[in-house]
C-alpha cells in the first residue's frame, strides 16, 4: 500500500514505557532513536512530558516520563542523522506543567501529543492551544473511544473540529477492542463531525488485530499511523513498526535498522519484561475492558495463564 502522504510515528519508548515505568537504559533509547533515523521514520515519540512531584518522582517512574531537554539532547547527539525524525512527547491531562515546556525554537522537541478521555476534552484542548502557542505541532488523542457514550464523543469531536490549533485528531483503540468494521465506523464518525482535521490511528493488539486494523485505517484514509518496534507496548502491545514498513512499500523507508534493533535490543529486553498477545489480553479486548485487570493477573505467577477463570470473573 503506497501513499505518499502517509507518515509513521514510532512510540516505542512512550508506549513501551508503560510496562516498566519508563526505566529504559539510555543505551536502549539511543538505539531506538538510531533505528528511527536510519529507517526514515517521520516522528519518534521519546516519552511523556509530565510534572515531577513528591509522589511522582523520576526515581520511581523513570526519566522518560519527564523528558528533560538535556536527556533528549544526549540521545539526539549520539547519532548523526541527515533527515532526523520529528521528536514528540505526550501530555497526560492533569499531570503536566506547561511552563516547563520551552518555546519550540529553543527545544529539540517538535510535537506535543495530548492524551485525554472524552470527559476531559476541554482540558485536553487547552493543553493543545498552549502547546501550539509555543510553536509545536500538536495532536489530540481521544482515548477509549470504544467505551465512550456516542453523543458525548460526537460533542467532543465537534469541539476539536473548531480548534484550529489541533493538527491531528487521533482515533485510539485503547482496549484493543476494535474489529476492522469498527475502525471504519468510528473513522466515518470522526470524519463527519471533525471534517477539518487530519486523522491519526493508534492500535492495541489485544485480539491480534493491531496490524490489520492499522491497514484498515490506511484504507479509510488515515495518514498518521502509530507503531512500535516489535509491537512493544502496554499489555498486548501495539502495531509492529517493522510489519507496517513492509506493508507500506514506500522507498523512503528502510526496515533493516528496525530488525537490527529488534535483534540486538528488543529480544534481550523480552527476557526482562513482557508484552504481546496472550489469551488474558484477548479476553479483555473482546470484552472492551481496560487492560489493568489483565495486567494484574499476568503479574501473578500463580494464576497468570488462568484464562478460563479470568473469563468467568470478567463476565460475572
Listing of model-derived features with the role each one plays in the protein:
Residues 1-316:
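Catalytic cores and adjacent flexible loops of soluble metabolic enzymes
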Amino acid at each position: 500500500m503506497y501513499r505518499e502522504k502517509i507518515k509513521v510515528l514510532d512510540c516505542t519508548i512512550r508506549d513501551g514505557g508503560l510496562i516498566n515505568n519508563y526505566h529504559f537504559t539510555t543505551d536502549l533509547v539511543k538505539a531506538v532513536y538510531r533505528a528511527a533515523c536510519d529507517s526514515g521514520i517521520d516522528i519518534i515519540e521519546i516519552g511523556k512530558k509530565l510534572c515531577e512531584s513528591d509522589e511522582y518522582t523520576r526515581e520511581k517512574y523513570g526519566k522518560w516520563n519527564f523528558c528533560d531537554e538535556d536527556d533528549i539532547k544526549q540521545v539526539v547527539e549520539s547519532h548523526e542523522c541527515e533527515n532526523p525524525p520529528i521528536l514528540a512527547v505526550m501530555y497526560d491531562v492533569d499531570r503536566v506543567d506547561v511552563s516547563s515546556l520551552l518555546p519550540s525554537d529553543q527545544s529539540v522537541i517538535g510535537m506535543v501529543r495530548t492524551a485525554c478521555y472524552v470527559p476531559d476534552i476541554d482540558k485536553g484542548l487547552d493543553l493543545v492551544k498552549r502547546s501550539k502557542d509555543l510553536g509545536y505541532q500538536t495532536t489530540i488523542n481521544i482515548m477509549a473511544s470504544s467505551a465512550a457514550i456516542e453523543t458525548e464523543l460526537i460533542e467532543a469531536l465537534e469541539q476539536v473540529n473548531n480548534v484550529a490549533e489541533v493538527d491531528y485528531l487521533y482515533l485510539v483503540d485503547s482496549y484493543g477492542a476494535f474489529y476492522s468494521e469498527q475502525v471504519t465506523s468510528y473513522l466515518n464518525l470522526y470524519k463527519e463531525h471533525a471534517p477539518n482535521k487530519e486523522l491519526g490511528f493508534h492500535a492495541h493488539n489485544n485480539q491480534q488485530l493491531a496490524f490489520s486494523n492499522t491497514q484498515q485505517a490506511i484504507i479509510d484514509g488515515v495518514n498518521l499511523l502509530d507503531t512500535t518496534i516489535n509491537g512493544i507496548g502496554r499489555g498486548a502491545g501495539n502495531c509492529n513498526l517493522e510489519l507496517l514498513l513492509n506493508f507500506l512499500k514506500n522507498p523512503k523507508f528502510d526496515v533493516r535498522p528496525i530488525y537490527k534493533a529488534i535483534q540486538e535490543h528488543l529480544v534481550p529486553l523480552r527476557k526482562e519484561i513482557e508484552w504481546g498477545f496472550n489469551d488474558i489480553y484477548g479476553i479483555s479486548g473482546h470484552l472492551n475492558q481496560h487492560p489493568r485487570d489483565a495486567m494484574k493477573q499476568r503479574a501473578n505467577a500463580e494464576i497468570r495463564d488462568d484464562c478460563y477463570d479470568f473469563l468467568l470473573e470478567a463476565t460475572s
